[in-house]
C-alpha cells in the first residue's frame, strides 16, 4: 500500500483521481457495522412490531439504494456501474442488536469500498431511525471494510474479523 494520498494534488488541493488509464477488473468490497440496542428493542424489531413497519426489510433496501448514490454523497467518489449490492442484517443477542454486512461489486477501474461502507452506514442509520421512538440509547458502531478484492492492490481481508466487535 502506498503512503501517498491519491485525492490530494501536489499543491494540497483535493482532486478526483483520473482512473481512465486503469484496466477494468472485477472488484468487490465487504463492509460491516452494528447497531447496539436494548434487548426489548431487538425483540420488537424481530417480531415485526415496530411502529414504522418492517425495520430489517426497509433498512436493507436503504443500504442498497445508498450504495448506488455514493458519488452523490462523497465528493471525490466516481459514479460507478455497480453489478451487485447485497445487504445482510443478522440479530446478535450478545450485542444485543443487529449486525450489518454489505457487499458491493463491479467490473471497473476503481474500487467499491466506499459503496460498501455507505451501504453499511445507511443500513445502520435506517435501523436507528425506525426504532429511535422506543430506544434513544441505540449505538451505531464498528463500521469498517472487512475485505476487498480486485484492482492493482490485490485482495485484502481483516485478519481478525472479531477484533473490533
From Swiss-Prot:
Pfam families: MoaC (PF01967). Gene3D superfamilies: Molybdopterin cofactor biosynthesis C (MoaC) domain. It catalyses: (8S)-3',8-cyclo-7,8-dihydroguanosine 5'-triphosphate = cyclic pyranopterin phosphate + diphosphate. Pathway: Cofactor biosynthesis; molybdopterin biosynthesis. It is an enzyme of class 4 (lyase). The active site is at residue 129. Disulfide bonds: none annotated. InterPro entries: MoaC, MoaC_bact/euk, MoaC_sf, MoCo_biosynth_MoaA/MoaC, Mopterin_CF_biosynth-C_dom. GO terms for molecular function: cyclic pyranopterin monophosphate synthase activity. The keyword Cell inner membrane does not apply. Substrate binds at residues 76-78, 114-115. PANTHER family: MOLYBDOPTERIN COFACTOR SYNTHESIS PROTEIN A. Belongs to the MoaC family. HAMAP family: MoaC_B. Homohexamer; trimer of dimers. NCBIfam families: moaC, PRK09364.1. This is Cyclic pyranopterin monophosphate synthase. It comes from Brucella melitensis biotype 2 (strain ATCC 23457). The lineage of its organism: Bacteria, Pseudomonadati, Pseudomonadota, Alphaproteobacteria, Hyphomicrobiales. The gene is moaC.
